[in-house]
């Protein structure tokens, strides 16, 4: 067997339907577009969401809310994520990035109280929840908001 002798399996490939190539093909003359009208013309499609002149659904629905351009998004770190660090070590944004806990460059890092902290740490983050601060201090560590 040679490379030039390779053929696809029978029935696995189908020939493309070539329209407008003579009346005996079954798809000659109008090429499956019907008679006259918008859809028989080139470029004869309606825009997305067009409902024939009826008020489209997206305009019938009421507007809701807005996008706050000043919103800051923080990378979320939970207490159980901090258990991987050594006892007594200092946790900064740089150490969180190098350990892979923070991947995106956002407005900062926020510490939340999900899970249980078992090691004593000095945590330096941009924001911290009240419960997370109490949990870090209960474990013997400190929290510094930078």
Curated annotation (Swiss-Prot):
Keywords: Ribonucleoprotein, Ribosomal protein, RNA-binding, rRNA-binding. GO terms for cellular component: cytosolic large ribosomal subunit. InterPro entries: Ribosomal_uL15 (IPR030878), Ribosomal_uL15/eL18 (IPR021131), Ribosomal_uL15/eL18_sf (IPR036227), Ribosomal_uL15_bac-type (IPR005749), Ribosomal_uL15_CS (IPR001196). Residues 1-54 are annotated as: Disordered. It comes from the Bacteria. The keyword Ribonucleoprotein applies. PROSITE patterns: RIBOSOMAL_L15. GO terms for biological process: translation. Residues 1-13 have a biased composition (Basic and acidic residues). GO terms for molecular function: rRNA binding; structural constituent of ribosome. Residues 23-35 have a biased composition (Gly residues). Gene3D superfamilies: 3.100.10.10. Pfam families: Ribosomal_L27A. Belongs to the universal ribosomal protein uL15 family. Binds to the 23S rRNA. Part of the 50S ribosomal subunit. This is Large ribosomal subunit protein uL15. It comes from Lactobacillus gasseri (strain ATCC 33323 / DSM 20243 / BCRC 14619 / CIP 102991 / JCM 1131 / KCTC 3163 / NCIMB 11718 / NCTC 13722 / AM63). The lineage of its organism: Bacteria, Bacillati, Bacillota, Bacilli, Lactobacillales.
């Amino acid at each position: 067997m040679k490379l030039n002798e390779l053929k696809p399996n029978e029935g696995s490939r189908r020939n493309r339907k070539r329209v407008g190539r003579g009346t005996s093909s079954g798809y000659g003359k109008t090429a499956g577009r019907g008679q006259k009208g918008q859809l028989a013309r080139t470029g004869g499609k309606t825009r997305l969401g067009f409902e024939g002149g009826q008020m489209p659904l997206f305009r019938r629905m009421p507007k809701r809310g807005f996008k706050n351009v000043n919103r800051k998004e923080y990378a979320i770190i939970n207490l159980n994520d901090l258990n991987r660090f050594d006892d007594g070590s200092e946790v900064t944004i740089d150490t969180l990035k190098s350990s892979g806990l923070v991947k995106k460059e956002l407005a900062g890092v926020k510490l939340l109280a999900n899970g249980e902290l078992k090691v004593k740490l000095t945590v330096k983050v941009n924001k911290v929840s009240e419960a997370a601060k109490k949990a870090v201090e209960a474990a013997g560590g400190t929290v510094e908001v930078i």
